[in-house]
Structure formats: C-alpha cells, structure tokens
Amino acid sequence: MSDVVNIVVWSKKGCSYCEEVKNYLNEKGFPFQNIDVSEKEKLRDILQVKYGVRHVPVVEIGRGNQYQGITEIGIEHLDLALANHAQIKEAKR
C-alpha cells in the first residue's frame, strides 16, 4: 500500500468554510484535489450516496481505495483526521 495520503476537498464557490479548509491545508503544506460542486447536482448526489450529506465542505483523506470522509464542520475535525493518518503512517514504518 502506498504511503502517500491523498486529500480531496469537495467545495463550492462562495463557501467561506470551504475556503477556510483549503487555506488550512495550504498553510500546513498538504496538497489536495478540489472538486467544485457548484451547480453540479450529480456531484452532490455522490456525496449523498457516500456520506449521507449534500453540504460542503467534505474532506476525504486516504490511501489506495480506503478513504475517510470528514463531514463535520470545524477545523478541529480535519486536524484530528490528519493526525490520525500521520500516526498510521508512522506505525507502518
């Protein structure tokens, strides 16, 4: 399994919390892929199926085909998930 952690941010234009999440990831030096769901109901449908939510931001963190979705609002939830993934990486070394 790859040690590379992939981060995907589901966001939309005009979402201040989405910008806060992206700024936080940039400040911490985490590269991420952004998926803009603005006016794209099919993308929101995917979030509904995967996580039971249609709101953004949703942040996915994972490796390979195993991802954790962070749907809770608050940087503390994202920070905890990032820390957990760092611990997993350290434990595998």
From Swiss-Prot:
The record lists the catalysed reaction(s) as:
N-acetyl-S-hydroxy-L-cysteine + AH2 = N-acetyl-L-cysteine + A + H2O
Give the domain of life: Bacteria
What PROSITE patterns is this protein classified in?
GLUTAREDOXIN_2
Q: Which cysteines are joined by disulfide bonds?
A: C15-C18
Pathway in which this enzyme or protein is active: Amino-acid metabolism
Q: Membrane spanning segments where?
A: none
- Gene Ontology MF terms in the entry: electron transfer activity; oxidoreductase activity
A biological process term (GO) from this entry? cell redox homeostasis
One Pfam match: Glutaredoxin
What PANTHER family does the record tag this protein with?
Answer: GLUTAREDOXIN, GLUTAREDOXIN-LIKE PROTEIN NRDH
Q: Which family does it belong to?
A: Belongs to the glutaredoxin family.
Q: What does this protein do?
A: Involved in a cysteine salvage pathway from S-alkylcysteine. Catalyzes the reduction of N-acetyl-S-hydroxy-L-cysteine (N-acetyl-L-cysteine sulfenic acid) to N-acetyl-L-cysteine. This pathway is likely important in the catabolism of alkylated cysteine generated by proteolysis of alkylated glutathione formed in the detoxification of a wide range of electrophiles.
Q: What is this protein called?
A: N-acetyl-S-hydroxy-L-cysteine reductase
Q: Which organism is it from?
A: Bacillus subtilis (strain 168)
